[in-house]
Amino acid sequence: MPNVNTLLAARGTTFTNNFASYPLCCPSRAPFSTGQYGHNHTIMGNAPPTGGYDKLAPTHSNTLPAWLRTAGYHTVHVGKYLNGYGRARPTEIPAGWAEWYGATDPSTYNFYNYRLNENGRLVTYGTGAANYQTDVYGRKAVELIRRHAPSAQPLFLSVEFVAPHSAGP
């Protein structure tokens, strides 16, 4: 942990009293979208029938991005969403998002040669160094912030990296 403290904590924010509500990806992400604990949102796994994108999909109109967009926010998502997103309907954009740059399965966990749904258009990124997934997400987020900065409209930007899931390159 010394490198983490030196490189991140000393230059940013630390959370000393935080916890994950569930030790799996989808059940841990669902509370952020729904505002509910696991026993209420019923997402208990990463794949059907207990979890994943299709399990949460029927509730998308009643999630944080939908609430914020209704309240006047410009809502943008960049990166990973939920396991299974994009497998059956790769150009679908969940309710509530004004802009969407979502990683689509089965390439979500690829750091190169992956595909994003960019506002309903599928874009494939290749193997060049400039296509490293974490860097692409970061550049998109910075560009979105810069583009939106002059606006008086509040911005909600969700940037969800894949690398922490698998200690990627």
Residue ranges and their predicted role:
Residues 1-169:
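Formylglycine-dependent sulfatase
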